[in-house]
A protein has these predicted regions:
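Structured mid-to-C-terminal alpha-helical surface segments
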Residues: 1-168
Length: 168
């Protein structure tokens, strides 16, 4: 099982951030130390590819939507933590694992955890899948999975007609 990064494992170092709380109950601020977003999301990508749960897909999608993530730095951090574990994931393995996720629901382990005003239905999940594939999976070094094309074609015929259209 994957473990969270520690400060000594960090590739990019620990960075200070200002944290502000301003609401009806409390107002205050503090300095906190944390990893850079690319490092945190690099471990999210690792988790997405190492476990069956898809909640990391939601998190990666949100990170790509809300933050100006440097995808190359994120992939470097992904590789760094895999190397620390001694458990590499090649691009071919990543593509295979991602496509296998489409054999089950992308949303069932996520939706119960979300606030009512956050929408993550099948259409949004499939768009998130495509974005993570195009912006992250396609950047993992190495050759792609040799069966990816035929698996994508089969999935398109089985209900995902726009799956990875225009993907690298």
């Amino acid at each position: 099982m994957s473990q969270s990064p520690t400060a000594s494992d960090s590739l990019l170092g620990i960075k200070p951030y200002r944290f502000v709380v301003d609401n009806d109950w409390y107002r205050g601020e503090a300095g906190i130390a944390s990893f850079e977003p690319e490092e945190l999301f690099g471990t999210k990508l690792r988790a997405l590819l190492q476990r069956r749960k898809n909640r990391d897909l939601f998190d990666l999608h949100q990170g790509l939507e809300q933050l100006a993530l440097d995808a190359d730095k994120l992939i470097a951090c992904f590789g760094h933590y895999l190397a620390l574990e001694g458990n590499p994931i090649t691009r071919a393995m990543a593509e295979q694992r991602m496509l296998e996720k489409l054999g089950r629901s992308l949303t069932e382990d996520v939706v119960p955890l979300l606030p009512a005003d956050i929408r993550f239905d099948d259409a949004v999940a499939l768009a998130a899948f495509g974005r993570v594939w195009k912006e992250l999976i396609a950047r993992i070094p190495g050759e792609g999975w040799k069966l990816a094309g035929s698996v994508v074609d089969a999935l398109r015929q089985r209900g995902y007609p726009d799956l990875l259209k225009g993907a690298a």
